[in-house]
């Protein structure tokens, strides 16, 4: 191409101070002294692209232009413009020239038909970039008429100490925005938006306050631009392939980094069919990477190709799971998971409750003695007979004057099993005459010297005659073994009171492996500090304990109605006569671990013999004469334990059975978790047995 023709076309636009509004400033001024070098740089493509190809071969895809010194220009003109690096150190006033440049933008936009980008580097002083971006290509399947309606407006909007924004706007629904940098000034952004709506083409140069360019006279430069379309398009394609479809730009002034994520098929719209096909294939291969670089208005095809790859595991919704598993399997699995969570929540609650109760009881067993006096005052009327009460909270004190509905069948025993657990203590209470005292064993007025007399005692019953009360105290006799002797007790209502279970007071520290049955009111000097009647059975006196009876009230320590019966008083059987029947009383048992002070553990029976009725005994018996005038019931508690496990045997005339209990209260609070695990396992096993026994 001819240099003279190009010089004539380029000469006028390159006067930087020439502007249409310079009339008030004294007219045009002298051009810069090195304008001829600029003309040569703009006119010779080989020189321009040779230097630029070297710069683009860098690994970081960036290039920095030479910063001219103000001494090389008459008025201190300083420019720093590049495609990849733009230094806007003196461009505060450049935003005022957008309106005056609209006519030139329309001319360039209407004539530009291809995606191209022209970069110029001036080795000495200047760097004048020219951005030309055409309409979208036909690679997206748009018709030629549709392409004519598309408008792309790449803009370079400089501002002082800010980045430059390169934005491609498509008014009819452009699918791509390429952002080189951001304009931080509001007025710059507003002007950029206005230019984008108008579909114009903006070229803004960084100039000093005293230097302006008359862009209206530079329309003739468009002919020169058309001459370089082919070479620019080829260079742009090569550069985009080298950069992987992306160009990074760094603004060193602001420290901000922006990305130029472009696609070949969108940058080179009207190339040959081969180019379009190549661009389409390349864009699809780079779709996933480009999705992370472009903004939210990226093209639909890129977004569709990359949507599946960009989904992370955190974004999976229940609908996705349903689609994979199927609706039936999903609901079946969901139901199973919900049931397991529900069961686990109940089990966890029970386990935590056991641990908490054990720690409370183990930490302060002696403090619970202060509340014994109110235990005997609990009214049995406050506990409904036919209601299954939680064994963790209540112990119904059987009273002779309370009329209890007779139980004629054993179905309530099964009904009680549902609530049964190893947390509760099982005991049987029955009345007996005070004349049977000689058949019972240890624990007299004064604590015996031997460690054996450590067992359970119950509150007194009113004596058979007179207005005073009488206690039957177990005493270890050297000739007879464990016997009971009468002892006058203080006035008392005679209630078998006591709360057994979670968060309830234990009156005394009881022997290990044996459940507590009942406690007398405090203040009796004939009881040892932590004295209880031993639950370990003495074989010597086991033959002296049997009594034929039909108890009026039979209930466990937790007041379940399945253990209550109305019976009539009967005479004592012979010493060697075994109990005819045993009835199993499946109850919730809340055992407590205690330090054993019994010396007769070795004599305790084990196995079935230890739990038979013939081996059972009554810890004590107290008779209320006033309440027995009209065939008042007698109550007997028969318990036995084995050396291998703690067992409570309940002996009645109408049935028999055995309920095993496990110790709960540890010696110290550190063992609470270990014991709770064992109790929890026992609860689960008991529930399994109950479920298997269901019809």
From Swiss-Prot:
GO terms for biological process: circadian rhythm; circumnutation; entrainment of circadian clock; negative regulation of transcription by RNA polymerase II; photoperiodism, flowering; red, far-red light phototransduction; regulation of circadian rhythm; regulation of flower development. It is found in: Nucleus. Residues 261-484 are annotated as: Interaction with ELF3. Keywords: Biological rhythms, Nucleus, Phytochrome signaling pathway, Transcription, Transcription regulation. GO terms for cellular component: nucleus; transcription regulator complex. Residues 54-74, 551-567, 579-588 have a biased composition (Polar residues). Residues 1-11, 216-226, 234-253, 260-283 have a biased composition (Basic and acidic residues). Residues 598-616, 636-653 have a biased composition (Low complexity). InterPro entries: ELF3-like. One of its GO terms (molecular function) is DNA-binding transcription factor activity. Induction: Expressed with a circadian rhythm showing a peak 14 to 16 hours after sunrise regardless of day length. Induced in roots after infection by nematodes. Up-regulated by auxin and cytokinin and down-regulated by abscisic acid and temperature stress. Interacts specifically with both Pr and Pfr forms of phytochrome B. Interacts with ELF4. May form a homodimer. May be a transcription factor part of a circadian clock input pathway. Acts within a 'zeitnehmer' feedback loop and is involved in its own circadian regulation. Has no role in regulating circadian clock function in the dark. Part of a corepressor complex consisting of ELF4, ELF3, and LUX involved in the transcriptional regulation of APRR9. The activity of the protein may be decreased in long day conditions due to its interaction with phytochrome B (phyB). Can regulate the initiation of flowering independently of phyB. PANTHER family: PROTEIN EARLY FLOWERING 3 (PTHR34281:SF2). This is Protein EARLY FLOWERING 3. The gene is ELF3.
